[in-house]
Amino acid sequence: MAFRATPGRTPPGPGPGVPSASFSSPQPAMAAPGGIEEEDEEEPAEIHLCVLWSSGYLGIAYYDTSDSTIHFMPDAPDHESLKLLQRVLDEINPQSVVTSAKQDEAMTQFLGKLASQEHREPKRPEIILLPSVDFGPEISKQRLLSGNYSFISESMTATEKILFLSSIIPFDCVLTVRALGGLLKFLSRRRVGVELEDYSVGVPILGFKKFVLTHLVSIDQDTYSVLQIFKSESHPSVYKVASGLKEGLSLFGILNRCRCRWGQKLLRLWFTRPTRELRELNSRLDVIEFFLMPQNLDMAQMMHRLLSHIKNVPLILKRMKLSHTKVSDWQVLYKTVYSALGLRDACRSLPQSIQLFRDITQEFSDDLHHIASLIGKVVDFEESLAENRFTVLPNIDPEIDAKKRRLMGLPSFLTEVAQKELENLDSCIPSCSVIYIPLIGFLLSIPRLSFMVEASDFEIEGLDFMFLSEDKLHYRSARTKELDALLGDLHCEIRDQEMLLMHQLQCQVLARAPVLTRVLDLASRLDVLLALASAARDYGYSRPHYSPCIQGVRIKNGRHPLMELCARTFVPNSTDCGGDQGRVKVITGPNSSGKSIYLKQVGLITFMALVGSFVPAEEAEIGVIDAIFTRIHSCESISLGLSTFMIDLNQVAKAVNNATEHSLVLIDEFGKGTNSVDGLALLTAVLRHWLALGPSCPHIFVATNFLSLVQLQLLPQGPLVQYLTMETCEDGNDLVFFYQLCHGVASASHASYTAAQAGLPDPLIARGKEVSDSIRSGKPVKPMHELVRRTQMENCQALVDKFLKLDLEDPSLDLDIFISQEVLPAATTIL
């Protein structure tokens, strides 16, 4: 299949390739009432993983506190090396790993190694062993069916609840059910997130979601680092010391234009889970291509504005479940719902052939209108912000309205009561007032007089002294007691009734939690694709095409997505590693000629295509890729206790042991960390190992300065090997780099030119060239002291010749001048 990039077509939109067995949630879009929007600082998310392995199958479930959701993975085959489990651990990075105390030996050894990994980033998980009885199949099933979930109506019968949960949880996957049961037991015992709550408050569970690893492309952390897919660096702000890090110059950094926090999280998730699922990838590309059309630019900008109002719905729902809702939560939820409705209305006018637009149109249901209408008609945002508590609008509850009217009329009424009280007081008391204090009631307030020093001086006949505050004496009188009996504690009564209404409103919202969860899922997906479309528009990316018929990748005029932003000009290069021809590409060339940039460019373009992004190339066709391995940079760490060369060997060993015929392997300067002969031998052995696999050889790009690899013909000749070089031109003493890849082999590394560019002294460079030439021609390398002695002899001979040429009979000869100008300067090089 030929390469092609067609940026102007609107293709039919296939649906997502990896369906999530979770609850839906819609989204809204319009401005909320006035007031200051407040978004709380999110607590650090915790992930607690429960895992069981038995008879070659793995059952996994984990709880994520960021969205109060339990994720599970159906029983999956995994051999004794537990590579699948390691992949899951690398992806979700749990705080704790819960498992049965009764385990197979392979699992026990794996957990022992996991617990001993001192260098694991950010930290090693806590291993928690529970009694095996807690993982019994029947007790786990009963634990799942008897759980109290906010998304299940209390009106459901036991049979209906079983049917509902059976549609979500695969009860035929025994290990998964046991893992879910053990996880629920752990959450109940540890009380994750509700440690300080009353014991009657359970751990909030807002949904179950299916966690899928199928069709994912394997990429290790070293590859993410060397390709600069992610790059964390210290934050320059002194106020960010706690969080400490920000995203540096990285692929994620330039593509992350998401407007909501959950969009950023989803983009990071896509980056950590590149996929081979063509239906899912094309579904993402269809949306990006649609928004790249010039006529759709205004629609994209409008949606971007709406997405900025989509906030942390799971956190709000969690607070509602715990009855910890804040005033700002209602305002944020109101804006979120109306923004989601705006997105739905916009998507209704877009092509329904695109799956995402169809999903938003269908799944942003009328429940959103119901939620928005309830909040808008009940919550008095202006008054709530003023009083910093939940208050309701007028005409919601006649009893509350009546009490508020009475409370508002109190000031004038209390003024009249105070005048009557003053008439009954001693004439020495100049003034008084009647005040209302919530929880205490009505009191008579009298200014403290000069003679009122001792407590006994505060006594006034007919009044009961209560307390002294700010030089005011507060008393109960017969009239204030009558007011207490007549009016009661109005403020607290109003507050209690409004809290009751808030609880009823919370129940209405929680009953529709699935639609809110789906809002977040689809809105974050739309946010990510709008961000990728924006980057593709600004940087001139094109749509990649996927072909299961080819192996490897074909790229026409590809560019490095980061380097092209840092360089004034960038020379594009093409790549063709499809089919059985040239599976091993050996790239030679001078230092600084662009070999490493080219390797990273191939890796990054392939990675971008596997996350469903447009790519920096004129055309790109991606075949079947199941993994990307790299040996480009040594990720050194003191805690590893390994030498730089040992780290290099470990990286190559990963590729040798795990790469298949569908893997992409990028190797840069392997073998440079040891003796050149040994390094060359190791590189040759690795390449010959892969070449011996024939058509099953991975797609390998090797950049090296070991020209002997080619000159000595250490690799077998055949169609599997292809030699490439970076084009250069010698212009006198200068070396001109064209940064263009071409067929052939470099004649020299031109290390001396690179050394001169780096500022090394000329004598050092000259000596280096002399040694290099001697080795290359097979001549012995002369030590430095012999060179010095030979130079001294040459200088002595030159001075003797000058003496022999003197004409001592010449009357014009001045020996003083001869000594000062010829002999003394030469003496410094002789003595």
From Swiss-Prot:
Protein task: Involved in DNA mismatch repair and meiotic recombination processes. Facilitates crossovers between homologs during meiosis.
Annotated stretches, region: Disordered: 1-43
Chain ranges passing through the membrane: none
Keyword vocabulary terms for this entry: ATP-binding, DNA damage, DNA repair, DNA-binding, Meiosis, Nucleotide-binding
Listed GO MF terms: ATP binding; ATP-dependent DNA damage sensor activity; double-stranded DNA binding; mismatched DNA binding
Ligand binding (ATP): G589, P590, N591, S592, S593, G594, K595, S596
Assembly and binders: Heterooligomer of MSH4 and MSH5. Interacts with HJURP. Interacts with C7h12orf40/REDIC1.
Name of the gene this protein is made from: Msh5
Keyword DNA damage recorded: yes
Organism: Rattus norvegicus (Rat)
Family, similarity comment: Belongs to the DNA mismatch repair MutS family.
Keyword Calcium among record annotations: no
PANTHER family: DNA MISMATCH REPAIR PROTEIN MUTS FAMILY MEMBER, MUTS PROTEIN HOMOLOG 5
GO cellular component, one term: synaptonemal complex
InterPro entries referenced in this protein's UniProt entry, alphabetically: DNA_mismatch_repair_Msh2, DNA_mismatch_repair_MutS_C, DNA_mismatch_repair_MutS_clamp, DNA_mismatch_repair_MutS_core, DNA_mismatch_repair_MutS_sf, MutS, P-loop_NTPase
GO biological process: chiasma assembly; female gamete generation; homologous chromosome pairing at meiosis; meiosis I; mismatch repair
Record's protein name: MutS protein homolog 5
